Swiss-Prot record:
HAMAP family: PhnW_aminotrans_5 (MF_01376)
Keyword terms, alphabetized: Aminotransferase, Pyridoxal phosphate, Pyruvate, Transferase
Similarity-based family: Belongs to the class-V pyridoxal-phosphate-dependent aminotransferase family. PhnW subfamily.
Enzyme class label: transferase
Organism phylogeny: Bacteria, Pseudomonadati, Pseudomonadota, Gammaproteobacteria, Enterobacterales
EC numbers for this chain: 2.6.1.37
UniProt-listed Pfam families: Aminotran_5
GO molecular function: 2-aminoethylphosphonate-pyruvate transaminase activity
Gene it is expressed from: phnW
Protein name stated in the entry: 2-aminoethylphosphonate--pyruvate transaminase
Modified residues (N6-(pyridoxal phosphate)lysine): K194
């Protein structure tokens, strides 16, 4: 364990502000109105407002990582007669397929490959051919590659065919402007430690109330029962069914204040975009190539091909960067040797410049 802070160039957990960390120095009682009404309920209202100005939506917080909330939605939203079309082009779409299989949920997996954008015409054809499909689920920002998927076009299909639409916006909500009502999203899933720049400990679901109310008695799990969690928070003014991650919640409340102070989602999106563009330009100047074409990139994380030099080892490159105070991500693409660099969190233009200088220094195989 080290006492030194590194700049995390990852898609979350990410580098947080000092004030977000300091918010966790306070201890809260989970039965206290100051906490449940004063903090939890305020967070729920703010999340819903960030997602849409339209009526009929609500927010539910759930202990655990983002995957817990994805599993809660799949396990609660789909009844025994339902079937979900899962659009997959990375590890997180594949994880939804695995979850559906383990829970015995009928599903059709449309796997378009890790470096390909989902083909909307192909999705249209699947929906047209199989009227038993009741739900569509997909990832927005697929951090396996840095791909930004077309949730608007798929949402239009979901609306046209009358399907319930589930979007894993884990690494995009709070960092990319969106209106979930306009996108026809029924369940949006995200996490505390992503673009809102909190710390790990809980995830959240912003859902259409009418859809959520229909989930009663459907859950395949006790602790991941999304309907029961929602009703507990509604009926008890922010109370969690099981132990609330109080310190994480306080940090998140502070992170929401800092998002507003920055200028909201639009301003944060602009910063993330500039970070990503500067990173890509600088890396290309150093001789690195991106895995994806520019038009496919999200402003969240970028995958770069590993150097072909026989001396190159990611572990050594990583170590040399870490010695200089920067932490990057290994690759997760099955067919390509690459590594990834995120640019969200408390990361600014000067940090990207410093990172590029550190990368130049760490390129031992060029010496």
């Amino acid at each position: 364990m080290t006492s030194r802070n590194y700049l995390l160039l990852t898609p979350g957990p990410l580098t947080t502000s000092r004030t977000v960390k300091e918010a966790m120095l306070f201890d809260s009682c989970t039965w206290d109105d100051d906490y449940n009404i004063g903090v939890v309920e305020q967070i729920r209202q703010q999340l819903t407002a960030l997602a849409t100005a339209s009526e009929g939506y609500t927010s539910v917080l759930l202990q655990g990582s983002g995957s817990y909330a994805v599993e809660a939605v799949l396990g609660s939203a789909l009844g025994p007669q339902d079937k979900v079309l899962i659009v997959s082009n990375g590890a997180y779409g594949a994880r939804m397929v695995e979850m559906a299989g383990l829970m015995g949920i009928a599903h059709h997996a449309y796997d378009c490959g890790e470096v390909a954008r989902p083909n909307v015409q192909a999705i249209d054809a699947i929906l047209n051919a199989d009227p038993t499909i009741s739900h569509i689920a997909m990832v927005h920002s697929e951090t396996t590659t840095g791909m930004l998927n077309p949730i608007d076009e798929v949402g239009a299909l979901a609306h046209r065919y009358g399907k319930t639409y589930i979007v894993d916006a884990m690494s995009s909500f709070g960092g990319i402007p969106m209106d979930i009502a306009a996108l026809h999203i029924d369940y949006l899933i995200s996490s505390a430690n992503k673009c809102i720049q909190g710390v790990p400990g809980f995830a959240f679901v912003i859902a259409r109330e009418q859809k959520l109310a229909a989930c009663k008695g459907r859950s395949r799990s006790l602790s991941l029962d999304l309907y029961a969690q929602w009703r507990c928070m509604e009926d008890n003014h922010g109370k969690w069914r099981f132990t609330s991650p109080t310190h994480t919640v306080l940090a998140f409340a502070q992170a929401l204040k800092e998002l507003a102070k920055e200028g909201g989602v639009a301003a944060r999106h602009q910063r993330y975009q500039q970070n990503q563009r500067s990173l890509v330009a600088g890396m290309r100047a150093l001789g690195f190539n991106t895995l994806l074409d520019d038009e496919l990139h999200s402003p969240i994380i970028t995958a770069f091909y590993s150097p072909e030099d026989p001396q190159y080892r990611f572990s050594e490159f990583y170590r040399r960067l870490k010695e200089q105070g920067f932490v990057i991500y290994p690759g997760k693409v099955s067919q390509s040797d690459c590594f990834r660099i995120g640019n969200i969190g408390e990361v600014y233009a000067a940090d990207i410049t410093a990172l590029l200088t550190a990368i130049r220094t760490a390129m031992y195989w060029t010496k």
